[in-house]
Amino acid sequence: MSVIQDLQSRDLIAQTTDIEALDALLNEQKIALYCGFDPTADSLHIGHLLPVLALRRFQQAGHTPIALVGGATGMIGDPSFKAAERSLNSAETVAGWVESIRNQLTPFLSFEGGNAAIMANNADWFGKMNCLDFLRDIGKHFSVNAMLNKESVKQRIDRDGAGISFTEFAYSLLQGYDFAELNKRYGAVLEIGGSDQWGNITAGIDLTRRLNQKQVFGLTLPLVTKSDGTKFGKTEGGAVWLNAKKTSPYQFYQFWLKVADADVYKFLKYFTFLSIEEIDAVEAKDQASGSKPEAQRILAEEMTRLIHGEEALAAAQRISESLFAEDQSSLTESDFEQLALDGLPAFEVSDGINVVEALVKTGLASSNKEARGFVNSKAVLLNGKPAEANNPNHAAERPDDACLLTDEHKRFGKYTILRRGKRNHALLVWK
């Protein structure tokens, strides 16, 4: 199966230029292809995964991937289908983000062998280009009429109070020149990107033909949508980042575990390297079992292992199991740090707090009266163990102090998992 056929079988092709000619070229020879990543934050998020993984799929098929980090274009920001002007970031900020994203992209690709991946930065050529060169050598090849007719530009112009600055309007010229430059430097003949990049990609194809007299191709990947119409890649806490310090491996694992049944088999095709036959077998087994599908667990394991590694996957599984177990002794200090980052609602507490106060502080009870009822009915657990009276000498005027949180409840001297009922948790972080 060719790489194009594999992408088609996974429904990973939104648009291409001359797919038959591209497929024939890929079957005849190994090519260089690229995808650009603008540094708009200090980390990639799961919305970047499709193009990153597509580069990897092409490399596994023997082609040479080029990961282009937009040190120059990131100074402007792509306006494609954005409702308003992007905020401009300082050169120092963008440079720091460039380095972070380069480091994140590196593990996905192999930089050894005959088709070793290439890491490029468009600041290397735009940093040496002056304004007159840009207008003479690049600008003259672009029709303003054609640029105004691009859907992404028309949407901004037609939106009341929005408009588009010349800075953002010129973005497609910069991205278009990237293709021509990478074609000249490395022989790149294919640009891939998200479906919102189609206009920028075709601009690059046209410019490369004019400047280099070469036929090149474009391929876009689909916009990832969820069956319920909500945006993929967002949680109540915001974006799901690939950086473990911004989204913990545990939360990352949980994100995939919570994928809807209607989406999970599509996402297995989109994001994993399991074969179509393996995915079809998982779906058939799930349908035949009549019980909880296995697909979400497989997806969560595959993605967490791919992004964070085997050790992080084991930690995510350990945390997931321990939160609902009586014995939480297997949790490590690092596990608690993940929970404090984004795994559980976390609350700072001080010595002397009792369980009733902790329940109200964390929102696990709406009042002291309700909290006492939970405690008396044995519905409250501390680190997996039922909360019990442990302070017989409490003051008569403070009856709730009969169940006091003490040092014995502190894991690693700092953390206590408070649980009410089966699924309601909070993390107490001791000052």
UniProtKB/Swiss-Prot annotation:
Its main location: cytoplasm. GO terms for molecular function: ATP binding; RNA binding; tyrosine-tRNA ligase activity. It is found in: Cytoplasm. A motif ('KMSKS' region) lies at residues 231-235. Its EC number is 6.1.1.1. It catalyses: tRNA(Tyr) + L-tyrosine + ATP = L-tyrosyl-tRNA(Tyr) + AMP + diphosphate + H(+). Residues 353-422 form the S4 RNA-binding domain. Keywords: Aminoacyl-tRNA synthetase, ATP-binding, Cytoplasm, Ligase, Nucleotide-binding, Protein biosynthesis, RNA-binding. GO terms for biological process: tyrosyl-tRNA aminoacylation. Belongs to the class-I aminoacyl-tRNA synthetase family. TyrS type 1 subfamily. Pfam families: SYY_C-terminal, tRNA-synt_1b. Homodimer. This is Tyrosine--tRNA ligase. A motif ('HIGH' region) lies at residues 39-48. The keyword RNA-binding applies. It is an enzyme of class 6 (ligase). L-tyrosine binds at residues 34, 171, 175. ATP binds at residue 234. GO terms for cellular component: cytosol. The keyword Cell division does not apply.
